[in-house]
Amino acid sequence: MMQNKKIIVVCGNIASGKSTVCRRIREKGFVVIDLDEITHQIYEQGTDLYYKLIDEFGKEILDENSDIDRKKLSKLVFNSKTLLKKLEELTHTDIILRVVKRIKKEKSDLIFLEISMYLESKNLVDKYINVDEDWVVVADRDIRIQRIIDRNNFDYDTAVTRINSQLDYEKKISEFDEVIVNNTTESDLILKVDELIDRKKL
C-alpha cells in the first residue's frame, strides 16, 4: 500500500450532516472525494457491476432507459439486511479501487474521503488505503428521523427503516479521532467545521 498523502475520512449516518461538513471542507479549498459519486459511475450501463446487479436483484431495479434506478435499488435493499449485505459485497471493492486511482491522480498532499458507511467497510478501506484520521458526524436519532421526513418526504416508518439499516455511529464515537455533533443549525455545524480545521492546522 504505497501512499504518501494524508487521508482523512469523514463519515456519518444518514441525515447526520456529513454532506454539509464535506461541502464546507470543499469551500475551504480542500480536495474531497465523494464515494457516493463514484458509486454512481460504477452503476453505469455496460459495467461489470451493472450486469451483476441485474443478475442478483432482477430487472425491476431498472428505469425506463434500462439504467440502474438507485431509488428502486435502495428501497429493495433497505428492507432486508441480507440484500443490503449482498449489495455491499458486490460494490465495495470496486468502489475502493476506484478511490485509490483518484487518490493517486490528485496533486494535493491532503485528501478527504466522504464515506457513508465507513465502519461497515473499514476492513476493506484499510486494506487499500492508509487512513490517517477519521472524523464522524453525529446527531440524535430523533433529529435524524425528522430530517429524513422533511428532506425526503418520507413517512415516519420509512425514515426509521432507513436509520435501522445502518450501524449507529453515535454508539461508536470512541472509535473515531474527531466527533462533530450536529444537533442544532447548519450555521453552527459550519462553525464547528471551521474551528476543527483551524485546530488541526490543516
Question: How would you label these PLM feature ranges?
Answer:
Residues V10:
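Hydrophobic anchor at the beta1->P-loop junction of P-loop NTPases
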Residues S16:
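ATP-binding Walker
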Residues N13, I25:
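P-loop (Walker A) phosphate-binding loop of NTP-binding proteins
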Residues I95-V99, K107, L124-K127, D150-R199:
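Small-molecule kinase domains that catalyze NTP-dependent phosphoryl transfer to phosphate-bearing small molecules
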Residues E37-D109:
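ATP-dependent small-molecule kinase phosphotransfer cores
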Residues S19:
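Walker A/P-loop
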Residues E27-L35, T47-D48:
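Post-Walker A helix-loop "phosphate-sensing" segment adjacent to the P-loop in P-loop NTPases
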Residues R98-K105, L113-R147:
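ATP-dependent NMP and nucleoside kinases share a basic, alpha-helical "lid"
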